[in-house]
């Protein structure tokens, strides 16, 4: 039986965490830099614990004004401090609630930059490995960040997106474009099933891109996140695909 993880970005102050945590199997917990608060983190951790959901850190650039979605070019020392600060804080809060942090998934611009920039990808992977080599690194399927994680000796989780469209090179369509996001349930479900069952996704130019779907992301800040999660989980199970971390 095929198996796939379902994840969402949480603790970003968007209000849908409790509902999503009854449907997903991995929670990407924001670390109060690009969005959210300590209270949001603690609440998300409590809901995750109640539902047996795997916990990962979701660190981003310290850029609340742009929700961490604007590219930054930090020095290695500044990036190390930025990530260690966020990972350390979440790890401490997890331990305080008797939980374990299992993986790291960078947020927004950091995630997308590292997908295409090998120097940044290597730096991010090295920082995570130095922080805790037992952590896994979640990154875009086929990306340089995924390769860097493997090279750094980390376990990796290859991620695909239910609610984002793809470029022919396998990267995500930039949010600045009007066709960046998938808004209909039907299109999201079809895209998910194609990625999980067939190992490919249709790009915006109609070409097919090979993907490895270890985990499917739904954005927790999206207006359709809960509906997507309900329907996608239902359709995966109906197709004989187990939803599990």
Swiss-Prot record:
One MF term in the entry's GO annotations: ATP binding
Reactions this protein catalyses: 5-oxo-L-proline + ATP + 2 H2O = L-glutamate + ADP + phosphate + H(+)
Keywords, alphabetical: ATP-binding, Hydrolase, Nucleotide-binding
Single Gene Ontology BP annotation: carbohydrate metabolic process
Enzyme Commission identifier(s): 3.5.2.9
Subunit note: Forms a complex composed of PxpA, PxpB and PxpC.
Protein name: 5-oxoprolinase subunit A
Species annotation: Neisseria meningitidis serogroup B (strain ATCC BAA-335 / MC58)
Gene of this entry: pxpA
